[in-house]
Amino acid sequence: MAKCRVRVSTGEACGAGTWDKVSVSIVGTHGESPLVPLDHLGKEFSAGAEEDFEVTLPQDVGTVLMLRVHKAPPEVSLPLMSFRSDAWFCRWFELEWLPGAALHFPCYQWLEGAGELVLREGAAKVSWQDHHPTLQDQRQKELESRQKMYSWKTYIEGWPRCLDHETVKDLDLNIKYSAMKNAKLFFKAHSAYTELKVKGLLDRTGLWRSLREMRRLFNFRKTPAAEYVFAHWQEDAFFASQFLNGINPVLIRRCHSLPNNFPVTDEMVAPVLGPGTSLQAELEKGSLFLVDHGILSGVHTNILNGKPQFSAAPMTLLHQSSGSGPLLPIAIQLKQTPGPDNPIFLPSDDTWDWLLAKTWVRNSEFYIHEAVTHLLHAHLIPEVFALATLRQLPRCHPLFKLLIPHIRYTLHINTLARELLVAPGKLIDKSTGLGTGGFSDLIKRNMEQLNYSVLCLPEDIRARGVEDIPGYYYRDDGMQIWGAIKSFVSEIVSIYYPSDTSVQDDQELQAWVREIFSEGFLGRESSGMPSLLDTREALVQYITMVIFTCSAKHAAVSSGQFDSCVWMPNLPPTMQLPPPTSKGQARPESFIATLPAVNSSSYHIIALWLLSAEPGDQRPLGHYPDEHFTEDAPRRSVAAFQRKLIQISKGIRERNRGLALPYTYLDPPLIENSVSI
């Protein structure tokens, strides 16, 4: 006979408790005990409860290997319960044979209906560390089960592959939004839709009467940053600053030679550059920068309210004056092929010509941001990381424990996006000039160009030559966060991988990397994505990239959407007239006629309001309430990571006090651990 204390912790979320009966059996090196019911007087397993149970085992099972948890309905059905599956969220189990000698079994899973969970003691183990056949068999069975539950599908040819579920109703509770998060998202969507519907804006297919009328819509859920955008959107300095610190801060690059198809001359830009210099001198000095939206050339366009929509493929040349002067646009060409019907617009042109040219650039920024930077890089690729993690890494694996907080809710939000945003006839088709067809074109085109280095911030900054451009807060804050993540990951890797050989010998890790390469990057070797990792250094870089992409990168390109776009002329989602082919034609009336119709603008506002802020149940970067790591060494690393993020946040907030428009999107407490909205 053997006696032990079993302590059980139930989650605090709404619906986490259960009326079902829970039993456990203990698996050890000498065998497995019979199922032992966990019950006492009163109700067990209420939400938020931690409960102790004294159990007696008929035999000694030897060294404990696993805990088998069994849940079944009560023998006597309770009123109103017989028609539903009673789910239970278990946080952890603890076994104590002697006082002070407890074994901890992390769980942090939902168990729906009648079923069974197998839990291992919390110490993380790489596959080559498991020598007992029972543990080896458990790892394999766990992965086989998850690979059946979470399978791949091709949603659109040429896109990264994704989860093979049609709707969020099909998802199991372990990858689904919490009840609170779901309710808040629904309330947000419903309130936004109702307000705009009552105002009649969703049914108006015509033009806005004036910018002043747009201003009245702008009163919808204002923010301080959005107010700043409204006040400064026409200014050249603000236009340029958005390439650095707006929602698409990843395109600008230093220009050392002008493209052949962008024939800017000294005469054109002399009024901006001033005396005593030239284009060639500024190119050699490194003070010119280029933003090229050429990927949009010839892209599919949409039809809205029965009218064809239009897109441009502009190139924008910007100049950084010496000293502390602002970055300014000095030339814009709206199409890729130069010619008499493709003028180069200049700041010295008529006010409305120049404003219209800048607005076409902003429309192109919107398309590339939403389709490529946001949807592809910050949603579809993180979904690949999430799905491969669930399919190839068992829960006891140190990299599963490290990554699971960073894939929370990603499969839910992406499944919801395929239902409500990118499906034919949904929000993207209702509000944007490219529609789902154009978005699909852009994603396919970028997938053919996408390189591993683009996903690694330090390499991307170097490749674009923007290491020293002043006022680039996305770079400054992002590099600090990248460094903090890399230091944290390096410590975790050093704990579990003593050598490069140990990385090479981890077959679960290698299967994970191969699956990301084959399913996410479609086996394209030119992407530079690894299909195997053979050193600790390569592993640290790869995991840092994954965590940064799922957290900071997503925050940088997602959190500011409402701020930047709610004043629609700053980032119009469509253009109703073609790009101008000559100068001197733009007027206030033609500017308004080019902008989106009222209903398209309004549907766009609904999408922005939904996608810009987390609807509750948030977990900021480095906040890990689910304690998957139980050993002292990784817990110390987590604490050090959290302290570093606090220091970074203090520095960002101190800097922001001196800025007219604070850059907050990479302040660590405002970064979500995962792609969850």
Curated annotation (Swiss-Prot):
Membrane topology: Peripheral membrane protein
Induction entry: By phorbol ester.
Superkingdom in the source lineage: Eukaryota
Residues that, per the record, bind Fe cation: H374, H379, H554, I677
Binding site for Ca(2+) 2: D39, H40, G42, E44
Annotated residues for binding of Ca(2+) 1: G15, G17, D86, A87
Keywords: Calcium, Cytoplasm, Dioxygenase, Iron, Lipid metabolism, Lipid-binding, Membrane, Metal-binding, Oxidoreductase
Tissue: Expressed in epidermis and brain. No expression found in heart, spleen, liver, skeletal muscle, kidney or testis.
Effect of V76A: In clones G2, G5, G11 and K1
E.C. number: 1.13.11.-, 1.13.11.58
PROSITE patterns per the UniProt record, alphabetical: LIPOXYGENASE_1 (PS00711), LIPOXYGENASE_2 (PS00081), LIPOXYGENASE_3 (PS51393), PLAT (PS50095)
Main localization (coarse): cytoplasm
Residues annotated as domain PLAT: 2-125
Swiss-Prot/TrEMBL catalytic activity: (9Z,12Z)-octadecadienoate + O2 = (9S)-hydroperoxy-(10E,12Z)-octadecadienoate; (5Z,8Z,11Z,14Z)-eicosatetraenoate + O2 = (8S)-hydroperoxy-(5Z,9E,11Z,14Z)-eicosatetraenoate; (15S)-hydroperoxy-(5Z,8Z,11Z,13E)-eicosatetraenoate + O2 = (8S,15S)-dihydroperoxy-(5Z,9E,11Z,13E)-eicosatetraenoate; (8S)-hydroperoxy-(5Z,9E,11Z,14Z)-eicosatetraenoate + O2 = (8S,15S)-dihydroperoxy-(5Z,9E,11Z,13E)-eicosatetraenoate
Similarity comment: family membership: Belongs to the lipoxygenase family.
PANTHER family, per database record: LIPOXYGENASE
Description of its domains: The PLAT domain can bind calcium ions; this promotes association with membranes.
Protein's name in the database: Polyunsaturated fatty acid lipoxygenase ALOX8
